[in-house]
Every structure is written in C-alpha cells, then in structure tokens.
Amino acid sequence: VLEQLKENEKNYEQTLLKTLLPAVKRSATITKRADAQLVFCIDVRSEPIRRAIERLGNYETLGFAGFFGIPIRVQEFESGKTKDCCPVLLKPRYRVDEKPYEVNSFLMEQHQQGKTIKTTLGKIYQELKYNFATPFALVETLGAWYGLKMVLQALAPSYTKKTSHALNHLIAPQLQTEPSFELDEDNLEHGIALSEQIDYAETVLRLMGLTSGFAKLIILCGHGSTTENNPYASALDCGACGGNHGGTNAKLLARILNKIDVRRALEEKGIHIPMDTLFYAALHNTTTDSIELYNLNTVKVLYPNLVNQLRVDLEEAKSSNNLERGQKLNSAHPEQDIQRRSQDWSETRPEWGLARNAAFIVA
C-alpha cells in the first residue's frame, strides 16, 4: 500500500510540473508593466481567484501571509472590542485603533445617535429578558415577530439579510474606517515608530518578491469568510490573523507604503517605488469570492478608467469562480446558490475551506 501511495504521489508530481512549466515560460517573457498587482494571502482559497484575475487582463498576483507581516492588536471602531490580528503563536507588538475615514460631521452624528439607540434597546431587552417578572410578557409581546423572523431566515435567507442590513444602515449608517497607527508619545503602547514602519515595509516587500516592476495600482487583499449561525466561523477566516478578517492589516500596510518618509527610506535601501504607484487595501470574501476595495476616493480621481476596469474584471473573476465551484456542487444557479450559502443559518459548511489542497509550492 505504501509503495502504491508513493507511486501515485510521484505521478501526480510529474503531471503537476508539466502543467506548470508552460506558465513559468510565459511569465518569464512578460516585461510590460502590469496595470495592477494584487497581493493575496497564501491560502488555498486565494489560488482560484488569482488565476481567474490573471486570465482577464494585464494583471499580476502575488502571495504573502494574510497579516502582512505586522503583528497588531486592533481596537474596533464599531464595537470597541480588541482583537489580535496576527498568528496565534505570535504576541501582538503594536496596538492600532480603527478610526472613521473621511466622514462629515452630519454622518458621524447620525451614526453615533443610531449606535446609541441600538445599544439602549439592547440593554432594555436584556433587562426584560432576565428580570424575574417580565420574561413571560416579553415572550408574549415579541414571540410572533421572532417567529416570523425565523421563518424568513429559513425560507428566504438572502432577502432577510438584505433587509436587516438596510435597516441597520438606516438607523446607524456604516462608516468606512482606517487604522490609526502613528506612535503616540503620550502612550507608547499605541502605534508604530517610523523606523519600525520602514523595517516592516522593506521586509514585507523583499519577502513577497516585490522590489521592482511596481504597477500603478497595487491592491493588498486581506481575506475573511461570511457565514451565519456557525460555531466554527473563525476557522474559515484568516488563520494568519488569528481567525479574524484581514482587512485592517491590509489597510495598515497600504498606508505605510504610501507614506513619503517610508518611500524615501526604502529608496536608500535599494527599493524604488515610482511616485505614480499607489497601494490600496481590499477584502477577499472566500465564501462568495467577492472583493471589496477599500477607500478608493483618491485613486478614482487619479486612475478612474483603471479602477472601473478592475472592478468589472473582479466581478467577472468572481462569476467565473462561482461557476466552476457550482459545477462541483451540482448547482443549477451557482452565483445565487453560493450567495445563499453565505447567508443561510442552516448551512454548516458554506464554503470549501482548506479542502482539496493537493500541493504547496514554495518559489
């Protein structure tokens, strides 16, 4: 049996090398500057979307650990909770806070008022639920509404999710955030010193092999999963981020690499980043293969055609992957089915996770 396994492995290895060789020869002859470069986590779920994107245009994709080399503890803006966005074997060295990004005072006030309303209603509900005299009245009052919600969640999960999201946004508009990471002289536990920012920037760029040939637009893609009522949800998120979404880590590195002081220091270390190169962050949803581009206000002005085409191609790559995955799931309507799986609270395995990983290539 062991000899048969070894023979099967050898045959697979030879077949894989024959498949990869033409792609290696093609990549060695490419000299044209890429329109955009996208950096994904070295996760098996990133590979299909990387292949799909590279087929669609003058794009190049790269891989790196999803925490992008910076071990941080993040304080979330919305919940106020902290999370460690680094591998569990590492201790976070820095604390960064999420702050609203380019928000006017009216929108900020509306968000805070809505947040206060939701917090107050939550406290009232908890008081009524656990008070000695009121639980029965609470059930009689809200039971029918909760029953209706359960039926809708079971029969129309996508509609229920959209409605819930719309109501939440109406009460407290969702704000885009960015990490606040500059070193605080009054609180040395918060932020990252400029010298350390430079060191991390150099290390990450060299490790991912990106020291020349920079595109105008470089997207750092963290990743995470969407699932409902799943006790194993964190296992589907980014392992390099400690079972959290990797969006904040991507935003942090993008902001560091866009800093003039950091680029000047990198120049002295032999890494020249062109002035027309911009780094931006994104989040790859591994359940649906959608990619959300963060805070692209500036880049829309500088490269509107490039950004618009990238959005179109990312959507096409998503559809292509959904179709490929849907065939394996025997689904008649792959996109709708995969979207439903991410929102269905009865779905214990909304995505393929790390299954079907046959080989790991270090190059």
What are these regions (language model features)?
Residues 1-30, 45, 148, 152-207, ...:
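Gly/Pro-rich turn-and-neighbor structural signature
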Residues 1-188:
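N-terminal extension/subdomain marker
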Residues 22-29, 55, 204-209, 215-216, ...:
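Generic recognition of flexible, low-complexity loop/linker segments
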Residues 35-38, 64-67, 214-219, 357-359:
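Beta-sheet entry/capping signal
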Residues 42, 70, 221-222, 361-363:
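Generic beta-strand/beta-sheet core signal
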Residues 42-48, 220-228:
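Gly/Ser/Thr-rich loops at beta-strand to alpha-helix junctions
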Residues 57-106, 177-217, 224-305:
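Catalytic or ion-translocation cores adjacent to nucleophile or general acid/base/metal-coordination motifs
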Residues 305-363:
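Long, compositionally biased intrinsically disordered regions
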